Amino acid sequence: MSYSKKQGKSNLPEERDYKQEFLKGDKPFLMCSDCGSVYFNKYWHHKIEEFNKLEKENNFQMKFKLCPACEMIKNKQYEGRIVIKKIPKKLEAELGKVITSFTRTAFEIDPLDRLIDIKKGKDSWEVTTTENQLANKLARKIKEVFNKIDVKHSFASDPSDVVEVTVEFK
């Protein structure tokens, strides 16, 4: 049996291009309805510009949902808690600056790293964060800046990820 070029269209489906073949079509992107962070490529991102570029290249649809950090804040939950005791009055302002600047930098790197609250009491401060590692790193930073400090870590039993750090000025 011979085939000629004049046979006309075959019953085979038309060739598909790369996007049709390998990209799965409508991929949902998640945007936090509270802070505006966007979830794509398996991570939460600040940079909406990256999303806009990808959206033009592919066929994506946006879905709105709270990111894990905003959800924790809404539910009054935390993963990191630092209790700072015996704070000298003359160091309170500097300590506040260290905490806010360190957590702001962490947030700029990762939108899920957040300072939830600083509760200032008579004898101690309670700092809560959305990530346990952020609390550990913040305690290390406080020790590095102020030197004469005792730091004690305690971890909640499984399945919880909560870390509680006690920082005490000498």
Question: What is the predicted function of each stretch?
Answer:
Residues K9-L12, N59-F64, L95-V98, T105-F107, ...:
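A short linear-motif detector with a strong N-terminal bias
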